[in-house]
């Protein structure tokens, strides 16, 4: 008997270095280890006919859509909706699906239609589950919670501090994120200029691809004018991320919307303090569960001065940085591992296909 065939649709996949790509690769590696035949297909720029051809060739037993609006919307096209409407579908909506797209009419309609097709819906945070009550209240019986994990994809060496020309005594903030408005890259850069003026030893490194042409061009020009303290470098190879985190002092997230940030989870696992925008998706990575010590500091994204205050707090207090980083590393050691996450995914897949086939997924054959 052939292995269970799983097709994961995601907006981007390796070699692109994005949160979606890293999540899909983490899943792929662990699910393959459990005996599944997994194919990851990026949907950005993919024509409906090409996806239809891939489905015909691969003949998946189930399709997992990661990001309802950007990846799942393709399945609503007539060429696919009519011919593959009975293919079991699992959807893991993104933070943007739940917090941005679902609040505008066009996006809300697309997200709702994709979720209505799903045999199962995966959330990876309690905040995500609560948000789904608003946008998929009639489908809550199909919502499954699968705790998120992380994995280091290699041990390549990369000293960001040295490669960017910063000194050992500088306090370096690191913001790995694609350059687009929802990530707040430009806003963090402009706010950090005030930090630098008040604390000349503060530095910041942005790493990520251009995901919005106009915004990225504006960002590029602003960075070029601030080379005294800021750098924008290309995406870092996944195999070097652990080393990159280890060479800086603070991990920064300035997003207006997040589901559950890979960067914040990885940053705290690397033992680094977090500075993050105070939005629902960022609170658990920073504060953990009730009774846990904080692992970072939140700032009000609507108040530029609050960003400056919180950043300066971390620049000035090395003991605080160490305490927050140690708390994050300790919490990460208690988190589910990637194989635990994969087992949770398999349980959801079995629930999705079991309604009609009553079969097991992992280790089939």
Go through the PLM ranges and name each one.
Residues 273-276, 280-283:
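Short hydrophobic beta-strand element within catalytic cores of glycosyltransferases
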Residues 116-141, 150-154:
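A short, active-site helix/loop in glycosyltransferases that binds the activated sugar's phosphate group
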Residues 288, 292-304, 313-318:
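Conserved acidic donor-binding segment of nucleotide-sugar-dependent glycosyltransferases
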Residues 166-193, 205-207:
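Conserved donor-binding/catalytic core segment of Leloir-type glycosyltransferases
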Residues 217-236:
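Nucleotide-activated donor-binding/catalytic signature segment of Leloir-type glycosyltransferases, i.e.
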Residues 176, 203-217, 234:
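Glycosyltransferase donor-sugar binding loop
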Residues 235-236, 243-248:
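Short alpha-helical donor nucleotide-sugar binding micro-motif in glycosyltransferases
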Residues 256:
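Aromatic "clamp/platform" in nucleotide-sugar-dependent glycosyltransferases that forms part
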């Amino acid at each position: 008997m052939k292995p269970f065939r799983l097709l994961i649709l995601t907006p981007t996949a390796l070699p692109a270095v994005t949160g979606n790509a890293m999540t899909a690769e983490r899943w792929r590696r662990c699910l393959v280890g459990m005996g599944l035949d997994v194919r990851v297909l990026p949907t950005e720029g993919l024509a409906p006919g090409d996806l239809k051809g891939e489905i015909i060739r691969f003949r998946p037993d189930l399709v997992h859509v990661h990001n309802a609006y950007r990846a799942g919307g393709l399945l609503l096209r007539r060429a696919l909706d009519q011919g593959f409407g009975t293919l079991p579908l699992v959807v893991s909506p993104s933070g943007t699906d739940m917090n941005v797209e679902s609040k505008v009419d066009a996006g809300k309609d697309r997200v709702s239609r994709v979720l209505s097709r799903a045999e199962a819906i995966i959330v990876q945070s309690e905040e995500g589950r609560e948000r789904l009550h608003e946008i998929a209240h009639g489908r809550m019986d199909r919502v499954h919670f699968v705790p998120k994990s992380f994995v280091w994809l290699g041990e390549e060496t990369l000293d960001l501090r040295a490669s960017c020309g910063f000194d050992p005594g500088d306090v370096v903030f690191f913001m790995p994120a694609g350059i687009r408005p929802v990530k707040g890259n430009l806003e963090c850069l402009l706010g950090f200029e005030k930090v630098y003026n008040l604390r000349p030893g503060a530095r910041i490194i942005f790493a990520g691809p251009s995901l919005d042409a106009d915004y990225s061009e504006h960002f590029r020009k602003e960075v070029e004018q601030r080379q005294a303290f800021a750098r924008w470098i290309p995406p870092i190879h996944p195999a070097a991320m652990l080393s990159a985190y280890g060479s800086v002092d603070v991990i920064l997230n300035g997003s207006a919307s997040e589901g559950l940030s890979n960067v914040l989870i990885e940053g705290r696992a690397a033992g680094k303090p977090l500075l993050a925008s105070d939005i629902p998706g960022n609170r658990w990575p920073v504060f953990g569960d009730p009774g846990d010590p904080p692992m970072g500091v939140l700032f009000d994204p609507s108040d530029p001065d609050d960003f400056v205050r919180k950043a300066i707090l971390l620049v000035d207090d090395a003991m605080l940085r160490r305490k927050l980083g140690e708390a994050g590393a300790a919490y990460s050691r208690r988190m589910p591992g990637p194989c635990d996450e994969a087992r949770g995914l398999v349980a959801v897949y079995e629930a999705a296909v079991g309604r009609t086939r009553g079969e097991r997924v992992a280790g089939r054959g």
